[in-house]
From Swiss-Prot:
Plays an essential role in early embryonic development. Plays an important role in the regulation of centriole duplication and directional cell motility. Disruption phenotype: Embryos display defects such as small head, small eyes and dorsally bent body. One of its GO terms (biological process) is regulation of centriole replication. Pfam families: STIL_N. The gene is stil. Residues 850-865, 1214-1230 have a biased composition (Basic and acidic residues). Keywords: Cytoplasm, Cytoskeleton, Developmental protein. Coiled coil: none annotated. InterPro entries: Sil (IPR026123). This is SCL-interrupting locus protein homolog. It comes from Danio rerio (Zebrafish). Residues 395-432, 455-614, 778-803, 818-884, 954-988, 1210-1243 are annotated as: Disordered.
Length: 1263
């Protein structure tokens, strides 16, 4: 069969139509039924024909007729009956009903036909309706026993609530209910006469006053969608009313969108449509127009040139839709309200049945003038809702986001947490650092403070503060002035507004690092600026600040210290001059600069801002609380913020301050964060916050700050507490100012501090548990000789006492003291001193211990700080003495980092007191230490030997702990020394070598003493940790090391110097920091960056800021940058660690030197507790150290190197204390050298870096 191919495409049209089925053509026409993408006209002009097609129609709730109110008599009688039964003068109830549109749609009628007695609400005074149904109108009623003609139905509060409810209804997406456009209240009263009941009824309703004008216009094409066809059909017209919105396509045809369609809230809208109504003036139309105008959900409302929008009405009486353009009436642009009232009286009879068919009728009118109207107008004029916000919504609906739409980014931003305004130089407005290691300290150059420190006190306070500085420098007795601190105490209640407290500043990097103080609240711009200076003063040695910024300090004296006006004001209220003193004093006496401050006593310590100041986010800026006190310049905010002397800065600081010379007082103890203060410090006018709980019993609040210096054990009252340092002395008079700083601590910073404290405590507890579990294993494990020794020693001391010093964010710098300390109060106290000397020194320095520990630490710092090296008169001392526990506490950590139980601290106090009872011993120790310091060369050799012995130990950290223990023991009474030599054979060769070295120094250590056992336990625990994770044990946290050492040099296998410094700055009390700084300064050379850091006299400021910057805390890029410019010696750090086995111990928490220093400082601390003489001695050496000027850091390091080594090796009993203080100071100053030594000795090679701040400043800014 032949097939013919036909080309249909070529067929004529008439043939094609006849040959192809119609069904096949539907596919080709399908495109006709497809809606093209809808796009709004590009031009929003002339969207429809605006020419009027009829008369204007006004739309309003009550435009044509006032609302009518129908009250069913039965409901009224029920209300009266309940009111009479309650026998109350005022009975609250509800009337429920409905609101309906009149049949002619010209008004509304309210019918109240139900009574609701309401139900009591728990926790609320008012009642709630029990049977409210959707669509009901709720009328709260007050039924009064007696009619009061002068009373009003609404109260001001009621009116405000009504305004808000109405506004919310207009702006929300809630279902449109006409009843919500009117809020009604009633006041009823009834008087009985025979069988007659006379009711007085007062009604008041609030509704929207916006009137709209609708003008008929020509029809606008509508896209024939299913919805449009349905609405146009007869069936659709008879259905319930519907409503929606109108949009347009590119052809300017209207597209109907239902109210529930989500597209309505994204597409441009040109109006609204409604169905199921008859007339345009229907109140429903008015209500829907208001919703369209004021809805905050409709993002794009397009109005015509005349500000009108379309209204399409599918009327019940018209087949085709009606078109109107509508706009608010003239003068009705804003969302406003009107009051409708009605008052009437009626008489009912008791025995007459209520009429069912005739309700009581009332008419609500806006024309009535009465007291209700007056009140309404008054409240309306004051209402924000009726003003700009609502008005703007009506005026420009398309651009207006209604009040409910106030979730704009800006407003959200306002509600979201963010930094407080920092009206300070851009350089200072660096982002707040919220490091994972919150204790990271910022180093700011003392110069960071404005040259113009605000002198809140005025010229007189300034001079006073200067004089205070002088006092601090000149006489410890002046410290007694710190008694004025009670004023400060008052200010403590006021948390400092400063946010920066968490990021303490070292004076040097003032510009680079957080200009915390300056960034403080603008209102305290001066204060805050001062605060930085204060901080710097504290951080930097007061001498440095005095020398370097004395010129500015004298003028800005009050300002730096008074950087917080609030605190100052508080202080000024009680002691106007004191605050200034405090301001000026703190910088001067802040740390190692005590000497300088003495040299420049007249100068306001404020200049200290230029000095290095170590600020602990938690600990007070000043090395010692007294320093905090002295810091008139000291950052007041930090005082209150960190010192814990905020509320009681003056008094509280004074005790600690006195005990803690800038050298001896651990900054952490005195400088507690607000959280710390609350934790460990009480707002005691006479005691430094830390000192309060930690203030030894011998401390007497009455003694004032100086009294705290007094060691009850010793029975010696050193008005010049360990804070004999000029800074402390000056501080005493200025202490009141400390309150100001406290008051400045911002709530968010305070919360952060509290949270950090809590986290630290949790971490400490965890670490304690870990250590305890590990300690058992270490005892069994033969790997760790130190651990074995510890178990040997531990048995003697119950494991009750366990102190964990943690360098938060520094790695785990931990020390676990043997329980022996707790078992024997005396021994434990001595041990605790040994142990805590490492700890307590550090603790005092870093305020690492928990509250209990802080208390004990405070006792130490207060007791020992004055003269005991163990309370690091110099940072080194603190570190060394606290090497075991305290060092792990992280020289900078402060109380929060390490935990001590009060029992431990108490026992320590007892033992310390007993030990202190032997002033001769401590004097001898000090003498020996001084002689050792003098013989720097010999000391250096000895240190090298010690280092070698340490290197011999299996684990540097264990060895270090062991060596530290002997040192600590040596610092402890000689009884312990004797025991130490008889220590179990388990002790490492390093221990033996160390003991030999100590004996060569003339120091006898009894390894068997309880203290020694405790020390051993501590060492062993550290050893265990080191074996498990050397980095964890050697975290480079040596803020105390002296703080600067670990900061400056590699103190541990893990480069935690930055964290250590940060922790030290944050958690060490001012006294601790001052001791560290003083120690550094005392060591005549500022060889150690740490010395410079703490001390940061005018001599060397460059090291401080960088000390905080350790590779562990830097990004790779930052590390490379620092190395590129020679700011970091990361590689050297490992070598230094190897060089200095003692430094290895510092990696454990403090260098061995630190341990020795700490041991010495512990002994000194005890001596201080026992006798003030030791404190005096310590202070003197510190002063000398400070006095010794060293122009070059290298020279300082060189000079301090031998001394530090001597401390490391020969922190023996009497020498230990003397040498320890000096060594600590020297070590701080020679931290770099020690760290270098560590590089050699420490196989774990701490990554600590020595940063040259001076060079760093010259480089481009990283932050």
């Amino acid at each position: 069969m032949n097939r013919v191919q036909v080309d249909f495409k070529g067929l004529p049209a008439h043939i094609l139509e006849n040959s192809i089925a119609a069904e096949s053509l539907q596919n080709t026409r399908s495109s006709d039924n497809v809606l093209t993408p809808l796009t709004f006209p590009k031009s929003k002009v002339a969207l429809w024909d605006p020419s009027a097609n009829g008369e204007v129609v006004s739309l309003h709730f009550s435009y044509y007729r006032n609302p009518r109110l129908f009250l069913v008599e039965k409901a009224l009688r029920l209300a009266h009956r309940h009111a009479r039964q309650t026998n109350k003068p005022r009975f609250f109830c509800f009337l429920l009903g409905t609101l309906a549109v009149d049949s002619d749609e010209e008004g509304v009628t309210i019918t109240l036909d139900r009574f609701d007695p309401g139900r009591e609400q728990t926790g609320c005074l008012g009642k709630a309706p029990t049977a409210l149904l959707p669509g009901d109108i709720l009328v709260p009623c007050v039924f009064e026993a007696q009619h009061a003609a002068s009373s009003t139905v609404h109260s001001s509060e009621d009116l405000n609530i009504s305004f808000k409810m109405l506004q919310h209804f207009c702006c929300s997406k809630e279902l449109l209910e006409l009843s919500k456009l009117l809020t009604l209240r009633a006041q009823l009263s009834c008087s009985e006469n025979m069988d007659r009941l006379t009711f007085n009824l007062s009604w008041a309703a609030v509704t929207l006053a916006c009137t709209l004008d609708a003008v008929p216009i020509r029809a606008v094409p509508i896209i024939p969608t299913a919805l449009a066809r349905n609405l146009s059909s007869p069936a659709g017209v008879t259905q319930n009313s519907k409503r929606g919105f109108l949009t347009m396509d590119q052809t300017r045809k209207l597209l109907l969108i239902l109210e529930s369609d989500p597209k309505a809230y994204t597409l441009p809208l040109v109006g609204i449509w409604l169905s199921g109504v008859t007339h345009i003036h229907n109140p429903l139309v008015w209500a829907w127009c208001l919703r369209y105008l004021h809805s905050s959900s409709l993002q794009d409302k397009v109005l015509s040139e005349g500000g009108t929008f379309l209204v399409v009405l599918y009327s019940l009486t018209h087949r085709d839709p009606e078109f109107y353009q509508c706009k608010p009436s003239t003068g009705q642009q804003q969302l406003s309200f009107q009051l409708l009232t009605s008052r009437d009286s009626l008489t009912l009879y008791k025995n007459v049945e209520p009429s069912e068919g005739r309700p009581l009728q009332f008419e609500l009118s806006s024309e009535n003038q009465n007291q209700e109207t007056v009140l309404f107008e008054e409240v309306l004029s004051q209402s924000v809702l009726t003003g700009t916000t609502l008005g703007a919504a009506s005026a420009a609906p398309q651009n207006k986001l209604s009040i409910s739409d106030h979730d704009s980014g800006v407003e959200d931003e306002d509600l979201s947490p963010r930094p407080s305004p920092n009206p300070h130089p851009v350089s200072q407005q660096t982002k707040r650092v919220h490091p994972l290691v919150p204790e990271l300290s910022m180093v700011l150059d003392g110069s960071f403070l404005d040259g113009s420190v605000v002198n809140t006190q005025g010229s007189t306070p300034l001079s006073h503060s200067q004089s205070n500085v002088h006092r601090r420098n000149s006489s410890p007795a002046l410290q007694g002035l710190s008694v004025l601190r009670p004023l400060v105490q008052g200010s403590v209640t006021k948390p400092p507004p400063i946010r920066r407290p968490l990021t303490p500043i070292l004076s040097q990097p003032k510009n680079k690092l957080h200009p915390n103080p300056s960034q403080q609240t603008p209102q305290h711009s001066v204060s805050r600026k001062s605060l930085p200076s204060m901080r710097r003063s504290r951080e930097g040695s007061s001498a440095s600040s005095v020398s370097s910024s004395s010129s500015s300090s004298s003028t800005k004296n009050a300002s730096p210290n008074g950087s917080f006006h609030q605190q100052r004001q508080r202080l000024s209220q009680g002691f106007p001059n004191k605050p200034q003193l405090i301001y000026s004093g703190p910088p001067t006496s802040g740390h190692s600069s005590a000497k300088k401050s003495s040299s420049v006593p007249s100068q306001t310590p404020v200049p200290h801002p230029s000095q290095h100041r170590i600020f602990h986010s938690t600990p007070a800026v000043n090395p010692c609380n007294c320093c905090t006190n002295h810091p008139s310049v000291a950052p007041l905010y930090q005082n209150n913020t960190w010192q814990g002397t905020p509320g009681y800065p003056t008094a509280v600081h004074s005790p600690c301050v006195f005990h803690c010379s800038p050298e001896t007082v651990p900054p952490g103890d005195h400088c507690l964060s607000p959280s710390r203060q609350s934790l460990g410090c009480r707002v005691s006018p006479t005691k430094s916050p830390v000192c309060y709980h930690s203030t030894p019993p011998h401390y007497s609040p009455s003694s004032g700050p100086c009294v705290p210096t007094i060691i009850s054990n010793k029975g010696l009252v050193e008005q010049t507490p360990s804070c004999q340092a000029q800074c402390c002395q000056v501080k005493g008079s200025k202490e009141p100012c400390l309150d100001t700083p406290m008051g400045l601590l911002p709530a968010d910073a305070y919360r952060m501090l509290i949270d950090q404290e809590r986290q630290l405590k949790l971490l400490q507890l965890q670490i304690q548990k870990l250590l305890e579990s590990q300690s058992k294993v270490p005892e069994v494990s033969s790997e760790q000789n130190a651990q074995q020794q510890r178990p040997n020693q531990v048995p003697a001391s119950p494991p009750k006492r366990t102190s964990v010093s943690i360098a938060v964010g520094t790695g785990a710098s931990l020390f676990w003291s043997t329980p022996q300390e707790t078992s024997t109060h005396e021994a434990s106290s001595l041990e605790w001193q040994t142990e805590t000397e490492p700890k307590s020194g550090c603790q005092n320095d870093s305020t690492v211990t928990s509250r209990d520990r802080s208390e004990s630490a405070c006792h130490y710092s207060e007791e020992h700080c004055p003269g005991s090296p163990q309370h690091p008169t110099s940072p080194q001392h603190n570190t060394s003495s606290g090497f075991g526990v305290q060092m792990f506490q992280s020289p900078v950590l402060g109380e929060s980092a390490s935990m001590y139980y009060q029992s431990q601290s108490q026992s320590k106090d007892l033992s310390e007191n007993r030990e202190i009872d032997d002033p001769r011993f401590y004097h001898e120790l000090l003498g020996q230490v001084q002689s050792r310091l003098q013989d720097s060369v010999i000391v250096e050799d000895k240190v090298e030997q010690d280092q070698q012995s340490l290197l011999k130990t299996q684990s540097l950290s264990p060895v270090v702990h062991q060596s530290r223990k002997p040192l600590t023991t040596s610092s402890i009474p000689q009884t312990q020394k004797t025991k130490q030599p008889s220590s179990p054979p388990n002790q490492d060769r390093v221990l033996s070598a160390t003991l030999k070295q100590l004996q060569q120094f003339g120091v006898n250590i009894d390894l068997d003493s309880s203290q020694e056992k405790t020390t051993r336990a501590t060492v062993e625990s550290a050893s265990t940790l080191a074996c498990i994770n050397p980095e964890a044990v050697i975290p480079r946290l040596a803020l105390s090391e002296p703080v600067g050492a670990s900061i400056w040099g590699p103190s541990g296998s893990v480069d935690l110097s930055l964290e250590a410094n940060a922790i030290a700055l944050k958690y060490l009390s001012d006294s601790q920091l001052s001791r560290l700084s003083l120690g550094s300064q005392s060591s005549s050379p500022h060889s150690d960056p740490s010395t410079i850091l703490l001390r940061r006299p005018a001599v060397e400021k460059s090291n401080v800021a960088l000390s905080i910057l350790s590779p562990s805390n830097m990004s790779l890029a930052t590390c490379k940058y620092m190395k590129k410019y020679g700011l970091i010696e990361g590689e050297i750090s490992s070598e230094e660690e190897q060089e200095d086995p003692i430094q290895v111990d510092s990696a454990l928490g403090c260098s061995v030197q630190h341990e020795t220093s700490k041991t010495i400082s512990l002994g000194q601390e005890r001596e201080e507790q026992n006798t003030a003489v030791l404190k005096n001695i310590t202070n003197k050496p510190v002063v000398n150290l400070h006095t010794s000027p060293i122009d070059s850091q290298e020279q300082i390091l060189q000079d301090l190197r031998p001394k530090m080594q001597l401390l490391l090796r020969g922190g023996t009993n009497s020498e230990k204390e003397n040498a320890t203080k000096r060594n600590l100071i020297e070590r701080r100053s020679s931290l770099t050298e020690n760290q270098r030594t560590q590089e050699v000795v420490d196989p774990q090679g701490s990554v600590g870096n020595f940063l040259d701040l001076s060079r760093l400043r010259q480089l481009p800014k990283l932050f």
